[in-house]
Amino acid sequence: MPQKYRLLSLIVICFTLLFFTWMIRDSLCELHIKQESYELAAFLACKLKE
C-alpha cells in the first residue's frame, strides 16, 4: 500500500512541475530544486528578447 502512495506522490509532483513550467514558460530558462540528497535541475532553451 505505501508503494501506491509513493507512486501517486511522484506523479503529482511531476504534473505540478510541468504545470508550473507551462505557466511561466516565457520567463523560465533554468530551474534548480535542492532537497537533502536530491537535486532536480531543468533547463530550457531560451532566446534573449531584443
Swiss-Prot record:
One cellular component term (GO) for this entry is: plasma membrane
What's the main place this protein lives?
membrane
Spell out the subcellular localization from the entry: Cell inner membrane
| Spans through the membrane | 7-24
Q: What does this protein do?
A: Toxic component of a type I toxin-antitoxin (TA) system. When overexpressed kills cells within minutes; causes collapse of the transmembrane potential and arrest of respiration. Its toxic effect is probably neutralized by antisense antitoxin RNA SokA.
Q: What family, per the record?
A: Belongs to the Hok/Gef family.
Listed name of the protein: Protein HokA
